[in-house]
Amino acid sequence: MSLITIVGRGHGGTRAISHTLIASNVYMGEPLNRSGDLLPPQAMYEACRLLARSVLWQGDLRWDFSQLHTMPIPTEFTDLIHTYLHKVLTAPDEHKGWKIPETTLVFPWIVRMFPEIKYIHWVRNPRDNILARHLTDDLKDFGVTYPDAETLLASRYPALLAAATVAEDKEELLWRVRRALSWHYQHAIVAATPKPAHWIVVRFEDFVRDQTATLARLEEYLGIPLGRIVVRSETVGRYDRAEGASYFDFLEEGMREFGYAIPS
């Protein structure tokens, strides 16, 4: 029996791998939304807020996650996770798993609770990732302290802020900064966590451009045959066709790690 989970930010193309696993007879729980997220999510959301209390914001774009790796995991947290995953964990299926983007926000304790399961880290170019809204755009909703978007713009990118003279443009710019901060934070929390025994990184773009080769990697990793799903090539590189800012320099480290081009 194998248990699988996906680690990846919302709007990161994670529905593609969830739908792939479902098409491959992997039980992903029920009910699911159209993105393949296990519902209801409230217990997971509360677990995110609980873990966030033990993350120390050091100011600017720095957080200290170190105590998450050694402190006792609160019973309240494990109870919330077991509540959320009840149908998956008690299912008799040979292969099963779950997907919800908020798993990334609790990754350090999920790894400690489930050290032997198979993790798929699903990443997407943040320049595409920040173009559309997701529930995790404002990390304060999940208890995470991070810089104020407008203050950050004023100090680091004053020209961008000054150019946003229309209210709607300014609002969209602020949300893109929040999404970029969310991507950056989630990259940081995963990077700071000791990796489990079973860990693979897959880029959404590689899945779209060469599904066959990417599925071959995943099949070798998971040890099961995987079905194909329909993908749309236009989901890659949308930032080239989008108006407004899609890159902030604090994203550079994460982008380089995953092999994404840095704009000049």
Predicted regions: what they are:
Residues 1-80, 234-238:
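PAPS-dependent sulfotransferase catalytic core
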Residues 1-5, 10, 22, 134, ...:
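PAPS-dependent sulfotransferases, especially Golgi type II membrane carbohydrate sulfotransferases
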Residues 7-8, 98-103, 123-124, 204:
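Short His-Asn-centered micro-motif
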Residues 15-18, 104-107, 127-132, 208-212:
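Short catalytic/ligand-binding loop motif for oxyanion handling, primarily in non-cytosolic enzymes
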Residues 47-49, 136-140, 218-220:
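Short, hinge-like loop/turn segments at secondary-structure boundaries
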Residues 76-107:
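Glycine-rich phosphate-binding loop used to anchor ATP phosphates in small-molecule kinases
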Residues 99-100, 110-135:
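Conserved phosphate-donor/acceptor-positioning beta-strand/loop module used by diverse small-molecule
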Residues 110, 131-136, 141-145, 213-215:
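Short aromatic-enriched loop/helix-cap "lid" or pocket-rim segments at secondary-structure transitions
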